[in-house]
């Protein structure tokens, strides 16, 4: 039975493939091993469910983060494009931006004459904000956006893989449980049959 869980089949992130039980009698040779076997299957099932919950939380976080990165990138590109146009008027840019889900506000941005002086402040997380030249900020945002989209793709693939394995393990647990119920019924009938024998 231990060889059943030592499968070398794994997905790209190392999550092991769930075994499928076709014949319970091949797995459980001795009925006294049922509890151990059933507990191992239940344990693996709970591990898959935990991994799935973790991946779903990651997906939720990424689905919130990606639009924020896209909006920030769009604003930075807009600032750079405005400074590239070389607008001769020294009028500041008037921007409308989102503070939170339901609140928007306006900002007035003065564009420096030298584009090299154009800098933006980016929140990096954990209450840290750094000032970057506009070109570096755009490159950083593009990289973070690409990484986040890649992580979303990977996490979505993992959730689908885990969903399939959870279903397989639930079927395995049901087969084991039904096998044990049938074994107990057969044992009970055999005992009742021996009681009725008259010698």
Curated annotation (Swiss-Prot):
CDD domains: Prefoldin_3. InterPro entries: PFD3, Prefoldin, Prefoldin_subunit_alpha. The modification N-acetylmethionine is found at residue 1. Keywords: Acetylation, Chaperone. GO terms for cellular component: cytoplasm; prefoldin complex. Gene3D superfamilies: 1.10.287.370. Pfam families: Prefoldin (PF02996). The keyword Acetylation applies. Belongs to the prefoldin subunit alpha family. Present with 6550 molecules/cell in log phase SD medium. This is Prefoldin subunit 3. The gene is PAC10.
């Amino acid at each position: 039975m231990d060889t059943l869980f030592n499968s070398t089949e794994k997905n790209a992130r190392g999550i092991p493939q769930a075994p499928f039980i076709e014949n319970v009698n091949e797995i459980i040779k001795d009925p006294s091993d049922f509890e151990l076997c059933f507990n191992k299957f239940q344990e693996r099932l709970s591990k898959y469910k935990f991994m799935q919950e973790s991946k779903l939380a990651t997906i939720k976080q990424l689905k919130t983060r990606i639009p924020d990165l896209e909006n920030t990138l769009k604003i930075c590109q807009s600032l750079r494009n405005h400074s590239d146009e070389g607008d001769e008027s020294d009028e500041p840019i008037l921007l409308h931006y989102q503070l939170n889900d339901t609140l928007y506000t306006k900002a007035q941005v003065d564009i420096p004459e030298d584009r090299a002086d154009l800098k933006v402040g980016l929140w990096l997380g954990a209450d840290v904000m750094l000032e970057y030249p506009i070109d570096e900020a755009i490159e950083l945002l593009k990289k973070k956006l690409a990484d986040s989209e890649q992580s979303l793709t990977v996490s979505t693939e993992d959730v689908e893989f885990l969903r399939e394995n959870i279903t397989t393990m639930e079927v395995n647990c049901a087969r084991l449980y039904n096998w044990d119920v049938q074994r107990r019924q057969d044992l009970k009938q055999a005992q009742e049959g021996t009681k009725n024998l008259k010698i």
